[in-house]
């Protein structure tokens, strides 16, 4: 037996659905802009301060065990990627890792967040956060929150697809 709240109507339910849909579109559009900026600034600042494979050097990171896990995750994302630029790199080069500017584009936002949090404190980490007008600790927290919100959106979308598929 399905119960409805008193005074509920199809119009009320539809208006809530429309509002929810528009809010989700707005949030994901803005999150995508932030994601592109984070990828770009991370690749640009770190590659200009160090070199193209800086992310492979344990010297730049707080925790070597966490760094090894990050490299493993990057390698997993590299092996599973179906991006054309990744396929072209694999075809042309035998390097185990892509240059950082390609790696930052290919990696998940979650991986980038973990990578940023594991960077040694200092000028480079501060420079990335400063681009966004934030102290590095606040930026790290916001980046983690953005990953969380984005994951909620993705899970919601996947659940919606499953519901429609099963219906």
Where are these regions (language model features)?
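Long, contiguous internal "core" modules enriched in hydrophobic/ aromatic residues
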Residues: 1-167
